[in-house]
């Protein structure tokens, strides 16, 4: 038995010396999973989360699921396999993501959701999201003002599987529908995509040449819409977005898009990491699982202070 123990210890020491034979579990790894980074909002989330995690002494594993629930599930498996201490997740669907978050919980890994909620409570430790309804009302109020309280308009909606798309649309309509001379002539989903928004806007414009405004569920679609309008020589159409991206900031400053609504992507992601750190070190949980962060209207008056989804002093 002593010989066996000596051999076992020798093998263990040899494996450590080689640095290749032992499983690679990171004692201080935080996994950060978001949609694709070609959308600057999601990139800002990842950058903010990674910066805060490294500041607090963690290693990071950054992955993108491209709004594919199956791919997201595989990434949760990767995080589990790597022994992550926490997962920061902007999920791939309110219903489709519940099982993946539960899988992480069952493996002893807490999840901290940002931007998008899931249709379940008690599965994630935290769900930190923008106050999308409040933000949408801000955007709609500015849109109505810019439209002079009348005229035909178009609404571009996000992914149907994303609860934010519906919440923002409801917030828009709860304001706009109070103005009887504001008339919706088209409402279509462009799935948060700039390319789809460009194509949809071209088609809508052909059928409705008399439109006066476009209100968009996010900035990426707003950028697609303004590009299509400008290509058609329609610089008179009012476009309002939602997110607070640098691209839209620049468009506002140059007289293109008229307004957007800032949701604090960077700060939201950093708060999630801070809460994950408190949980990892002390098992401290936030007072509320679902937490709302208010949005801010961005227009020509304050666009110059906007940088990477945050207002500077």
UniProtKB/Swiss-Prot annotation:
GO molecular function annotation: carbohydrate binding
Protein name: D-apiose import binding protein
Pfam families xref list: Peripla_BP_4
Chief location bin: periplasm
InterPro entries: Peripla_BP_I (IPR028082), SBP_2_dom (IPR025997)
Family: Belongs to the bacterial solute-binding protein 2 family.
Binding site for D-apiofuranose: 39, 115-116, 162-164, 168, 218, 243, 263
Keywords annotated in UniProt: Periplasm, Plasmid, Signal, Sugar transport, Transport
Function of the molecule: Part of an ABC transporter complex involved in D-apiose import. Binds D-apiose, D-ribose and D-ribulose.
Signal peptide from the UniProt entry: 1-26
Disulphide bridges: none
Cellular compartments annotated: Periplasm
GO CC, alphabetical: periplasmic space
Presence of keyword Signal: yes
Residues that span the membrane, as ranges: none
Source species taxonomy: Bacteria, Pseudomonadati, Pseudomonadota, Alphaproteobacteria, Hyphomicrobiales
Keyword Transport recorded: yes
């Amino acid at each position: 038995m002593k010989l066996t123990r000596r051999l076992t210890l020798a093998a263990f020491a040899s494996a450590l010396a080689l640095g290749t034979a032992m499983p690679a579990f990171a004692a201080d790894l935080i996994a950060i999973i978001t949609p694709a980074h070609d959308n600057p909002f999601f990139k800002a989330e990842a950058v903010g989360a990674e910066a805060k995690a490294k500041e607090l002494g963690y290693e990071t594993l950054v992955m993108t699921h491209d709004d594919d629930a199956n791919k997201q599930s595989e990434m949760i498996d990767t995080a589990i396999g790597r022994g992550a201490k926490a997962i920061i997740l902007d999920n791939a669907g309110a219903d489709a993501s519940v099982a993946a978050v539960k899988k992480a919980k069952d493996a002893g890994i807490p999840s901290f959701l940002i931007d998008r909620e899931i249709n379940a409570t008690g599965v994630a430790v935290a769900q930190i999201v923008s106050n999308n309804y409040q933000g949408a009302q801000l955007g709609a109020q500015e849109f109505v003002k810019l439209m002079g309280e009348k005229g035909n308009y178009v609404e571009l909606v996000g992914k149907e599987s994303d609860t934010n798309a519906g919440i923002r649309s409801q917030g828009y309509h709860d304001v706009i529908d109070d103005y009887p001379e504001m008339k919706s002539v088209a409402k279509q989903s462009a799935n948060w995509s700039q390319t789809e928004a460009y194509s949809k806007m071209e088609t809508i414009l052909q059928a409705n040449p008399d439109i006066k405004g476009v209100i968009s569920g996010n900035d990426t679609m707003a950028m697609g819409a303004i590009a299509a309008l400008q290509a058609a020589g329609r610089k008179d159409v009012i476009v309002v977005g939602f997110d607070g991206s640098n691209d839209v900031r620049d468009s506002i400053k140059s007289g293109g898009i008229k307004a957007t609504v800032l949701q604090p992507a960077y700060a939201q992601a950093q708060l999630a990491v801070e809460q994950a750190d408190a949980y990892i070190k002390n098992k401290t949980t936030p007072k509320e699982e679902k937490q709302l962060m208010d949005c801010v209207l961005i227009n020509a008056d304050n666009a110059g202070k906007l940088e990477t989804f945050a207002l500077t002093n």
